[in-house]
Structures are given as C-alpha cells and as structure tokens.
Amino acid sequence: MNLKPLADRVIVKPAPAEEKTKGGLYIPDTGKEKPMYGEVVAVGPGKVSDAGQVVAMQVKAGDKVLYGKYSGTEVHVEGEDYLIMRESDIFAILG
C-alpha cells in the first residue's frame, strides 16, 4: 500500500463482513452489515496543538480498533478497501 496519512489521520483495513449467519444461511451483499472494527495499517505523525507541539498518536500500525458505523472515508487502493479517519473517530483499541 502506498498511502501515508497526514496529521492525526489513521488508515484502517476493515474486517471482512460476515458471509453467513450462525444458522448457516448465506447473506447477500446487500444485506451485510458494515463491520465496525479493523486493523490499523498506517498512522500519521499526530495533530499539532495550539501551542505548536505535535501531539503523539495513541494508536499504531497493527492495532485492532473499534470505530463508529459511519466513521472515515472509504478508499480503494491497489485492489484493497481501506478507511481513512481521524484518530478521534476510533472508540477503542481491542486487545
């Protein structure tokens, strides 16, 4: 992947949507729920505070994160889907 996020932005690879229900029924693409968790693949340098200091990011590449249903902007790069979002759109680090 050739994307480098700026400021406090994070690039997340969303987890794949469920293909079938617990009962074994296959879910069509139109009925799949958008996953709200994924893996951080790249992190920007951090946000610049009002005092001019760079505020360090709390997430790092490789972290599994939980984010809002409508968080981020979807992008398609080199055949893969990613989300670009601000660090503040991330609710928690799973672990």
UniProtKB/Swiss-Prot annotation:
Record bears the keyword Phosphoprotein: no
Record-level GO BP terms: chaperone cofactor-dependent protein refolding
Keyword terms, alphabetized: Chaperone, Cytoplasm
GO cellular component terms attached to this protein's record: cytoplasm
ATP-binding found in the keyword field: no
Localization: Cytoplasm
GO molecular function, one term: ATP binding
Assembly mode: Heptamer of 7 subunits arranged in a ring. Interacts with the chaperonin GroEL.
Record-given protein name: Co-chaperonin GroES
Protein source organism: Chlorobaculum tepidum (strain ATCC 49652 / DSM 12025 / NBRC 103806 / TLS)
Primary gene name: groES
